[in-house]
């Protein structure tokens, strides 16, 4: 886990509710951007490919299907995308034939595609060689757009994308989370181990 602001609260919660795994944390003392945080955490990454998830959003998908898709495509990078979102402040992803990513624009002024970046990525370790040589940088603005020349694919999911990046969206998501008609994959953990929100 890469943590920053309020990182102690996140580390404490996962320390108490870790289940059958040992969580590892990299605390960023200063903002590094999404890319800088991933680059700093790479010293702990042992798998190839490796999974990156945004911590302020939730989009349900089957990680095994994502991995099979990534492997079948021989992808260097795979991004989960959804059309089940009406917000304008998400990354816009254009897919071509065979789900190849043709463009990725973070929060464009004018949206010309229906696919939204779901904040879930699967990367081959070789992508690390493309990381910018700076301490603070954006995965969405500086790495993903340049990957369009690589085997970079979009994994389409019909799942809704929930963002808790603003106080208003957090309030909305808390209501959705409490709705018994909405199922989340972590609901049983939520009920057994206490509130995540």
Region spans (language model):
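Conserved N-terminal catalytic core of the sugar/cofactor nucleotidyltransferase
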Residues: 1-54, 60-65, 130-133, 166, ...
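Conserved beta-strand termini and adjacent loop/short-helix elements that scaffold enzyme active sites
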Residues: 2-4, 26-28, 80, 155-157, ...
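Residue-level signal for inorganic ion chemistry
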Residues: 10, 41, 56, 70, ...
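Short, hinge-like loop/turn segments at secondary-structure boundaries
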Residues: 16-20, 44, 69-71, 94-100, ...
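A structural micro-motif
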Residues: 21-23, 48, 75-76, 150-152
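Catalytic-core segments of class I nucleotidyltransferases/pyrophosphorylases
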Residues: 50-51, 58, 64-71, 84-87, ...
């Amino acid at each position: 886990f890469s943590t920053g602001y309020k990182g102690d609260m996140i580390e404490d919660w996962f320390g108490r509710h870790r289940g059958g795994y040992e969580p590892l944390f990299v605390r960023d003392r200063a903002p590094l951007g999404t890319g800088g945080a991933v680059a700093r955490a790479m010293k702990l990454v042992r798998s190839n490919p490796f999974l990156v998830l945004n911590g302020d959003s939730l989009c349900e998908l089957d990680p095994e299907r994502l991995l099979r898709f990534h492997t079948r495509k021989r992808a260097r990078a795979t991004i989960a995308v959804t059309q089940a979102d009406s917000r304008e402040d998400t990354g816009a992803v254009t897919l071509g034939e065979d789900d190849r990513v043709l463009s990725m624009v973070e929060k464009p002024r004018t949206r010309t595609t229906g696919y939204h970046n779901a904040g879930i990525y699967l990367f081959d370790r070789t992508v690390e060689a493309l990381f910018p040589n700076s301490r603070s940088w954006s995965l969405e603005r500086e790495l993903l757009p340049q990957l369009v020349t690589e085997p970079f694919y979009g994994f389409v999911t019909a799942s809704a994308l929930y963002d808790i990046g603003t106080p208003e969206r957090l309030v909305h998501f808390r209501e959705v989370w409490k709705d018994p008609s909405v199922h989340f994959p972590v609901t049983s953990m939520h009920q057994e181990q206490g509130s995540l929100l």
